[in-house]
């Protein structure tokens, strides 16, 4: 297959970290490894941004959304993206690209204009349901329309009658891999050899449902189970969750690590007997769940959104949302059975390698967008 010139365009790829940003960087790296020329477009970067190997990064100024009049969230997002396109758009047209990919619907006008002026294929990979008037008209003009899960594709079809093809998010399986127990980290958090550890790694917002994980651990502790729950991440819900933990009398059982670097999460998962993701809101995919599975940790997660597509039979279990009792029931079975947890961890790892590795995602991207023809 001949190499192509590809632009991945997303303002926040270079200014923050999250699922969309991880996807853009991971796909850029995967496509570069497959021989393509890849340019990553983003806003003027924040400190600490590391360009992916083999990828040229192009950054441009923009006006932060907070500086625009508060005429609604959608207005501010559009205005911010248009301010970015004002600086980046010319290079996007002049870059002689074969394909341009965006990951946010607010970039669709800039994408379609660049495609019309340059002849590049216009591709949108949806990671959520940020709908707005005119969304359906814009996506009908795309050359390829992709979604991060079958659930997300179905939600889009319900909204505008157009169903994208599915391209799951990817996981860096070289970084997220099973590791030996990190004794220094265990010592830092006061974890003893005989204690079972459960982990949740996510942003602490209401839709992540962490209070139900806390409830489950309280139930297990009341039964005499020697368990600790590490909650890795920051966010506005942390003070309320800490207060809730104190109310339940779980002080010493529940440990809030604060912000935890993504590239160090495998070390945290090396302590885990299980990972808990008690999501209660819309989750288009569940990248944190896939990362835990890739580290060989069995997962208990909720049956919402695209999460069932991530959790394999034999590698984890799904429970109803808002049900701490169901989470406790699963952990009660798993924690005393290391052989079962090991088998589940191996099954989860195989599932991620087969479906979500970046080599696999890069290959499927080429097929879905017509580059493999």
Question: PLM features: what roles do these ranges have?
Answer:
Residues 22, 26, 196-219, 225, ...:
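A conserved mid-protein helix/loop that constitutes part of the nucleotide-sugar donor-binding site
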Residues 80-84, 102-107, 126:
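Short His-centered aromatic/hydrophobic patch
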Residues 151, 170:
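Carbohydrate-associated surface elements
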Residues 177-191:
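A short helix/loop element that forms part of the nucleotide-sugar donor recognition site in Leloir-type
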Residues 242-260:
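Nucleotide-activated donor-binding/catalytic signature segment of Leloir-type glycosyltransferases, i.e.
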Residues 259-260, 267-272:
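Short alpha-helical donor nucleotide-sugar binding micro-motif in glycosyltransferases
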Residues 270-284, 297:
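Acidic donor-binding loop of glycosyltransferase active sites
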Residues 313, 317-324, 333-339:
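Conserved acidic donor-binding segment of nucleotide-sugar-dependent glycosyltransferases
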């Amino acid at each position: 297959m001949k190499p192509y010139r590809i632009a991945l365009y997303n303002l926040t790829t270079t200014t923050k970290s999250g699922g969309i940003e991880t996807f853009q960087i991971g796909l850029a790296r995967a496509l570069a490894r497959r021989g393509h020329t890849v340019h990553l477009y983003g806003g003027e970067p924040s400190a600490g941004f590391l360009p992916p190997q083999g990828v040229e990064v192009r950054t441009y100024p923009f006006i932060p959304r907070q500086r625009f009049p508060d005429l609604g969230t959608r207005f501010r997002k559009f205005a911010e993206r248009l301010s970015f396109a004002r600086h980046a758009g010319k290079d996007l047209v002049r870059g002689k690209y074969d394909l341009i990919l965006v990951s946010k619907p607010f970039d669709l006008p800039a994408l379609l204009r660049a495609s019309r002026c340059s002849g590049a294929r216009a591709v949108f990979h949806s990671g959520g349901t940020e709908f707005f008037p005119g969304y359906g008209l814009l996506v009908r003009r795309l050359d390829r329309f992709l979604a991060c899960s079958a659930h997300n594709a179905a939600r889009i079809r319900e909204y505008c009658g157009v169903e994208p093809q599915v391209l799951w998010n990817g996981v860096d399986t070289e970084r997220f891999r099973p590791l030996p127990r990190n004794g220094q980290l265990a010592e830092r958090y006061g974890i003893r050899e005989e204690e079972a550890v459960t982990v949740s790694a996510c942003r602490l917002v209401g839709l992540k449902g962490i209070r139900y994980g806390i409830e489950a651990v309280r139930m297990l502790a009341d039964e005499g189970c020697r368990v600790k729950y590490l909650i890795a991440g920051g966010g506005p819900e942390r003070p309320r969750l800490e207060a809730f933990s104190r109310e339940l009398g779980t002080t010493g059982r529940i440990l809030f690590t604060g912000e935890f670097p993504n590239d160090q999460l495998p070390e945290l998962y090396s302590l885990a007997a299980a990972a808990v993701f008690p999501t209660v809101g819309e989750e288009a995919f569940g990248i944190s769940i896939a990362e835990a599975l890739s580290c060989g940790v069995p997962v208990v997660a909720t049956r919402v959104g695209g999460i069932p597509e991530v959790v394999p039979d034999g590698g984890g279990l799904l429970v109803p949302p808002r049900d701490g009792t169901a989470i406790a029931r699963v952990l009660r079975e798993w924690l005393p059975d290391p052989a079962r947890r090991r088998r589940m961890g191996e099954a989860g790892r195989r599932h991620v390698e087969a479906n979500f590795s970046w080599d696999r995602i890069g290959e499927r991207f080429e097929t879905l967008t017509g580059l493999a023809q």
